[in-house]
């Protein structure tokens, strides 16, 4: 059969049939337009309802926030003693909160003991460190660990961390682990006991000297961090870094990862944020650390940081920034307000392991 014959067989045999076919096509087109119009109306209605609901949700949230603030104000006013400020009443409240119990408390006491030894080691060798984040909050607000916190956070200048690593290399009591974390593209540094059965550790975060404490300028480092993560993701040579997101700095191939971080650090100098100590007007959260997108990039003036002060933490005297209040407000806002992460705080050590087995036994004998 020719193409012409095939086309003829597919066409209506009469004008009437052709006309009927045309009417059918018009009807189908009309139905299609009606369906399209219906979808448009549905989308417009859905958008209108969404906008209306969003406005109502925002209004409800504002009302709840206002009510929450009013109730807190009323509660604190009734809680405070005569001639006691609201802030002092809040601190008194936090310091009277029950301590953690069981394995969690053993871990905290073990970390406090380790921190005391770390403090002595740093003082003996002229190294500067200071409490940051939850550890600083605990020192100022609780006089020790926040009851639901299970890790210890300390900040150090890059050169002091490098010296510390050398010192610990000749000290059989302790060890330092340097691990690259692919999940959050960071360099994780921890100070621990040489005994691997003791799970206590101190997280060490790197700070660099900065031209100024200008946070808008420091935000440029966030872009460099994004570039770092993308470069690592696209580096086919790093295919070995996959089964486990944690890769030790001393392992084979780590020099390739290290080179990416060093290149990013050089860019932080080239862009005019990081500088030498002699030219510094502040300090800045280094690109080696993890990046929290919910907060501005941390930068502090020299006056807010140095000279370091001393504060008590679980009976141990530790270093805190010169202006701890400025540090805490930059991280938490009103840090004396009631927290929202009591039950959702991330567990750095398995709490099940703390209640049984070799870990529990090691902590019990160690913390006593």
Report residues per predicted region.
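Beta-sheet entry/capping signal
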Residues: 128-129, 153, 310, 317
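Helical scaffold of the NTase/Pol beta-like nucleotidyltransferase catalytic core
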Residues: 50-65, 69-131
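Conserved catalytic core of two-metal-ion nucleotidyltransferases
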Residues: 99-123, 165-223, 232-333, 338-368
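Active-site nucleotide-donor binding segment shared across nucleotidyl transfer reactions
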Residues: 119-152
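Catalytic metal-binding acidic patch
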Residues: 143-164, 315
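Flexible coil/loop interruptions and hinge/linker segments embedded within long fibrous stalks
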Residues: 3-49, 56, 60
